Amino acid sequence: MAFSLDSILRDNIKNAKPYSSARDEYKGTEGIFLDANENPYGSAIQKMVNRYPDPLQRDVKTALSALKNVSAEHIFFGNGSDEPIDLLIRATCQPGKDSILILPPTYGMYEVSAGINDVDIISVPLTKAFDLDVDAILAAVKTHTKIIFICSPNNPTGNLMSEDKVKRILNAFSGIVVVDEAYIDFADTKGFVPLLDQYPNMVVLQTFSKAWGMAALRLGTAFASKEIVSVLNKIKPPYNINLLTQEAALEALQNVSVKDEMVYKILKQRDWLREELSKLPVCLELYPSDANFILMRTADGKKVYDYLVEHIVITRDRSKIILCEGCVRITVGTEAENKRLLDVLKTY
C-alpha cells in the first residue's frame, strides 16, 4: 500500500516552525559567542560545559553513518529511544482520535507514550510462540491507526520476529511501522537498517544503552527516511542530546572493538546460563533468546522474584503480563553474577 507521510502527519505539525537556536543560526566553532546567553567564565565543575552543544549532533551522526553504512540524513538521535517513540506519536496522532497498534507482550513505553498523548491503543497479542499474527494485525488496523510498533528482538520474550512477516506488514500498512531493535547487537542478523531505502514508512530504533553499555547517558537512534527525520528534528527540543553524551558516543564509535568484545562475553554467558537454568527444578521452560536476557517460566513468577530479592538478586517479574504467566526475565550478568543467581535458585 502506498505510503504518504504528509497524509498521516497532524496539520499543526505540517505547519509548525521549529525553534531556531543560536547554534542553528551560526554554525561556526570559532568566535566571540555573545548570542546564546551562556556563562562566559566557564563552568562550576572542572569539565567545561558552559556552551550549548551541537543541536543536530553532526559529528556523532557522521561516525555512526560510517559504521552503519547509512547517510547521516537518515539518522535522528533522541534522549533515549523513548524520545523518538514519543515524538512519532505526537507528530502523527491526533489526541482523542487516532490510534497506535502494539503487539503484547512488548516494551511498555509504546503504551505509556500513547496514553500520555491521549491516543487510542489497539492490542493484538503475539501468538503463543511469541510470533506475529500478521492477518490479525492487519485486520485490527483502523482508518485512524497511524503507527504499528514491532519490537525485535522482543522485550520481554527475547526472540527475533520473522523478517518476512515484518515485510508483509510494511507492504500492507499505509502508516508508519516502527521496528524497535534495542537488542539487535545480540542477534545473528543485520536487522532492518539495511532495508531503509525499500520502506519509506519504516523507522528502525536502536540504542547505545545495551550492547554499548551506555544506559546512563540516554542516547537512542531512529533510522528513517530523510522526510521522517526532518519531522523529528522539527519538533524535538533544541538541545536534546547533551555535550557529555555526544562526546561519549564519539569515543565509543571510535572503539567498536570494545563493544564487540562485551557482546561476545554476554553471548557466551547467555548460552552457559541457559544450559544451567534448564537443569533447575524451578525452571519449567526457557524461551529462545536473541537478546541479552532470558525469559524463564516458573510455577509462580512472583514468588521466585521475591525469593531472589530476599537474597539481593534482582530480576524482573513478568508474570502479570499477557502470555508470560509465571515468567521472570533474567538479564545476563557477569560470570560471577550468573553463578550467584544459580546458587540462590538452587535453594528455592
Swiss-Prot record:
Pfam families: Aminotran_1_2 (PF00155). Pathway: Amino-acid biosynthesis; L-histidine biosynthesis; L-histidine from 5-phospho-alpha-D-ribose 1-diphosphate: step 7/9. It catalyses: L-histidinol phosphate + 2-oxoglutarate = 3-(imidazol-4-yl)-2-oxopropyl phosphate + L-glutamate. GO terms for molecular function: histidinol-phosphate transaminase activity; pyridoxal phosphate binding. It comes from the Bacteria. This is Histidinol-phosphate aminotransferase. Belongs to the class-II pyridoxal-phosphate-dependent aminotransferase family. Histidinol-phosphate aminotransferase subfamily. It is an enzyme of class 2 (transferase). Keywords: Amino-acid biosynthesis, Aminotransferase, Histidine biosynthesis, Pyridoxal phosphate, Transferase. The keyword Cytoplasm does not apply. Its cofactor is pyridoxal 5'-phosphate. PANTHER family: HISTIDINOL-PHOSPHATE AMINOTRANSFERASE (PTHR42885:SF2), HISTIDINOL-PHOSPHATE AMINOTRANSFERASE-RELATED (PTHR42885). The modification N6-(pyridoxal phosphate)lysine is found at residue 210. Signal peptide: none annotated. Homodimer. Its EC number is 2.6.1.9. One of its GO terms (biological process) is L-histidine biosynthetic process.
